[in-house]
Structures are given as structure tokens and as C-alpha cells.
């Protein structure tokens, strides 16, 4: 029993320590709020917004947003941190976009998303600003549209963005008479920017057409989503022409021929068109609705096209091309590494050398009959920081003392290169926890071993 209590106490203590360690190592993603944003909003052609009716914004016209954001050096931005910008209620995103925010060094700085439901654009950062924390800056460019549910038009619309007041005159929705033969429009999906919705109305005046043949061909970089196709002859109502695409979508069908069309494919096997012939005479308006999928990325503001053509025994060939604007956005970021102060080390080295040399010249004595050369040389050398050389001969001596002091001074300059230092972001938590766990197991093993003995 006593052993079990000891074991329970040990496990409890270790659990508390491990829990405290885990809590201290978890890093929480933060919302970045300390920044400066210099922003501007213009019309799609770059001209400034104005409450002058002659410079009005069209009902469906997109507005261009430019945001230039800077962060103080002391603000730490970690991987997973986010920054959110919200549109005023008078504006809205037309579709959900996800786009990259690229750093000037070629690395990904963050992912940005626009949400048409909340009117927010959110950037989720990578660790680039941990590696390069100084002079942090970012730009975000995107389009938005007037939120027709929250404004009264025609007239002046006022709103605030980034603490700046804007005022713009907005036109009413254009009322354009539908072509008596064919009308076609397209628009980008609100949730998926890779999808384009197309709507077609043919023969809205309900005239009698013999053997009506329709042929629809989508533009480049698109394929038809077959399951989305709705193609129908609308119910004929005498004296009640189909005045709009909305009315066409709501009028009862006389015949649904969606499953009877013949599809065309391109060389890649993608469905890019369809055709159908209504035999005999028909005075029904025709409504067609379907979705295309983009097969490649589109540049900002580029329009994709879609063309439908009709022919019949008693009508001239006619075609109509519809366009859908592709919304897009982009971002850029820049920063630099935090450099350490440059260190200069000066090292002065002094070397003193003193040498003393004594030289004795040899003398040769000569008699009249005998030449006798006698030379005695004695050399003594001692090294004690001074060097002395002495030469002695049997003749006259000349002592020449010489002392030389040599001083050498050298300067060494050392420049330390800037080091890239990554702050702890909690990524080491797994490794450290594993190590702590092994230590705990080892301690527990020793404890049980000694207890049993």
C-alpha cells in the first residue's frame, strides 16, 4: 500500500510538471493590430471617387483598393499570426479569393483570403517576418463592389475606410432592352472564383421560329460543367413577353431539353460547347443556364467570353457574346534582417629586439724572411633578448657595439557578419517534450528499482 501511495504521488508530481511545461511551450497565433495603413479607393479606371453625377460609379462597377501597410520593428509577427481588414457595410466582395502575398526575396510571406459574407480580407503570415523582422511592410490590392442591399441609389453614397471619408455618386441599375433574338450574361461565383455562371435568353418576344438551331461555344480557358446545364423552352403566354433573365428563370417550362443537347470537346477532351435543334415551328422563349470552370489562372480584371449563335428557316443567323469579369487580387511584402552592431577589434603588438655585436679585426704580422699568419677567433653568443657577438684576434682589436630596437605594430580589424537568428516559435516543443518524457521514464525506473530492493 505504501508503495502504491509513493507511486501515485510520483505520477501526480510528474504530471503537474509536464503539464506546466507543455503550457509554457504552446505558442498562440495572434491578431496583428499594431500597424499603419495608407489606403486609397478609386474607380476601376483609376480615377478618384466623386459625388459629381458626371463622374458617377456604375451600378455594377468594381472599385479598386490599394493598401500600403507598415509595421513597427518592435512588433513581432510569427508564423500563423493574422491581419484582418474589413470593408465598410456599403461595399462587398463579389467572390471568395485566395491569393499569395510574396516577399521581395521570392519567398511566401502570407496567404490572403477575401470573404464576401463578412466583407473581410485576412492575411495569415508565414515565418518570413521572424527571419527578417526589420522595416516590415506589405501591400494588398483587391477589388470590391457596392453592396446594393445597404445603399440607396441613384444618389450619393458616403462611407469610411481606414478612417478616411469617401463620397461617390452611384448610378441606378441600367435598364437595357433585351435583344429580340438573344441575350447572354456571365458572372463569377460568389464562393468559388474558379466558376463562372452563364445565363442565356433567346426569342424573348415569343415569335414563331422554324427549326431553331442554337450553338453555344465557351471562350478559351474554360470548360462546361455538364451537370450544371439547364436548357428549356419556356411556357408561351400570349401578350406577356419575357422582359428579363430573372423572369426567364422563374417562368414555368414547356419542355426541358437539357439532356438532349450534343456536346463538343476540344483536343484536350474538355467540353467547350453544345448544340441543339428544336424541330418544327416554336414560339417559345428559350432559357439556358450553366456553369463553366476556369482551366487556367486569369489576370486581374480580365474578361472571359462565351458566344451563342442561333439560326432558323425563317430568321437570319444571329449571335451574341457574353462576358464575365474575373476578379483577382495580389499582395507584396518586404523586410530586412536585424543586423548586429559592427565590431572593430584593434590588436597592437610590440616586439623589441636588442642586439649588441662586438667585432675584432684580425691583424697579420710579417717578417722579412718568414710569413706568419696567426689568427685567433673567439666567438661567444648569448640569447637573453639581446644578442652579442664577440670576435677576438691576437692583433689589434676594434670593438663596435651595435644595438637595434625593432618595434612592430599591427592592426587587425574583425567584422562580424550578420547572423540570421530565428526566435523560438514553439516548433521545438515536440523534441523537448520527448526528451523530458525520456528523463521521466528513466527517473521512474531507477525509483522502482531501488524501492523493490
From Swiss-Prot:
GO terms for cellular component: extracellular region. Keywords: Cell wall, Peptidoglycan-anchor, Secreted, Signal. It is a peptidoglycan-anchor. It is found in: Secreted, Cell wall. Residues 426-453 form a propeptide. Residues 331-403 are annotated as: Disordered. InterPro entries: Adhesion_dom_sf, Collagen-bd_dom, Fibrogen-bd_dom1, LPXTG_anchor, SDR_Ig. GO terms for biological process: cell adhesion. The modification Pentaglycyl murein peptidoglycan amidated threonine is found at residue 425. Gene3D superfamilies: 2.60.40.1280, 2.60.40.740. Residues 342-403 have a biased composition (Low complexity). It comes from the Bacteria. Residues 1-29 form the signal peptide. The keyword Cell division does not apply. One of its GO terms (molecular function) is collagen binding. It holds the Pfam family Collagen_bind. SUPFAM superfamilies: Bacterial adhesins. A motif (LPXTG sorting signal) lies at residues 422-426. The keyword Nucleus does not apply. This is Wall-associated protein. It comes from Streptococcus mutans serotype c (strain ATCC 700610 / UA159). The gene is wapA.
Amino acid at each position: 500500500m505504501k508503495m502504491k501511495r509513493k507511486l501515485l504521488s510520483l505520477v501526480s508530481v510528474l504530471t503537474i510538471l509536464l503539464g506546466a511545461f507543455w503550457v509554457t511551450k504552446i505558442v498562440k497565433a495572434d491578431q496583428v493590430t499594431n500597424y499603419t495603413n495608407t489606403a486609397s479607393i478609386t474607380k476601376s479606371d483609376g480615377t478618384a471617387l466623386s459625388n459629381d453625377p458626371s463622374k458617377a460609379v456604375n451600378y455594377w462597377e468594381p472599385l479598386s483598393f490599394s493598401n500600403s501597410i507598415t509595421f513597427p520593428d518592435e512588433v513581432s509577427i510569427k508564423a500563423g499570426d493574422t491581419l484582418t481588414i474589413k470593408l465598410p457595410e456599403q461595399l462587398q466582395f463579389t467572390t471568395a479569393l485566395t491569393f499569395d502575398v510574396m516577399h521581395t526575396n521570392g519567398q511566401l510571406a502570407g496567404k490572403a483570403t477575401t470573404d464576401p459574407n463578412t466583407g473581410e480580407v485576412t492575411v495569415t503570415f508565414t515565418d518570413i517576418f521572424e527571419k527578417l523582422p526589420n522595416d516590415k511592410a506589405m501591400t494588398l490590392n483587391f477589388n470590391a463592389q457596392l453592396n446594393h442591399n445597404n445603399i440607396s441609389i441613384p444618389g450619393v453614397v458616403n462611407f469610411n475606410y481606414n478612417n478616411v471619408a469617401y463620397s461617390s455618386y452611384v448610378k441606378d441599375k441600367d435598364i437595357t432592352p433585351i435583344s429580340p433574338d438573344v441575350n447572354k450574361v456571365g458572372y463569377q461565383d460568389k464562393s468559388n472564383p474558379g466558376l463562372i455562371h452563364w445565363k442565356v435568353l433567346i426569342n424573348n418576344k415569343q415569335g414563331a421560329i422554324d427549326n431553331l438551331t442554337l450553338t453555344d461555344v465557351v471562350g478559351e480557358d474554360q470548360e462546361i460543367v455538364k451537370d450544371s446545364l439547364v436548357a428549356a423552352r419556356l411556357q408561351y403566354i400570349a401578350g406577356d413577353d419575357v422582359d428579363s433573365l430573372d423572369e426567364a428563370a422563374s417562368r414555368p417550362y414547356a419542355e426541358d431539353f437539357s439532356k438532349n443537347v450534343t456536346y463538343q470537346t476540344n483536343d484536350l477532351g474538355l467540353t467547350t460547347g453544345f448544340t441543339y435543334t428544336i424541330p418544327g415551328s416554336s414560339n417559345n422563349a428559350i432559357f439556358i443556364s450553366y456553369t463553366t470552370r476556369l482551366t487556367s489562372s486569369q489576370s486581374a480584371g480580365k474578361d472571359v467570353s462565351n458566344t451563342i449563335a442561333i439560326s432558323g428557316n425563317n430568321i437570319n443567323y444571329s449571335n451574341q457574346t457574353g462576358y464575365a469579369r474575373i476578379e483577382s487580387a495580389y499582395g507584396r511584402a518586404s523586410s530586412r534582417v536585424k543586423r548586429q552592431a559592427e565590431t572593430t577589434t584593434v590588436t597592437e603588438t610590440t616586439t623589441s629586439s636588442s642586439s649588441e655585436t662586438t667585432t675584432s679585426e684580425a691583424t697579420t704580422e710579417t717578417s722579412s724572411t718568414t710569413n706568419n699568419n696567426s689568427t685567433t677567433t673567439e666567438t661567444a653568443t648569448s640569447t637573453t633578448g639581446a644578442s652579442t657577438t664577440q670576435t677576438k684576434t691576437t692583433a689589434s682589436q676594434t670593438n663596435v657595439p651595435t644595438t637595434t630596437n625593432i618595434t612592430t605594430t599591427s592592426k587587425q580589424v574583425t567584422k562580424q557578419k550578420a547572423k540570421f537568428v530565428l526566435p523560438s516559435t514553439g516548433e521545438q516543443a515536440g523534441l523537448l517534450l520527448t526528451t523530458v518524457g525520456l528523463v521521466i521514464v528513466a527517473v521512474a525506473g531507477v525509483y522502482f528499482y531501488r524501492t523493490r530492493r
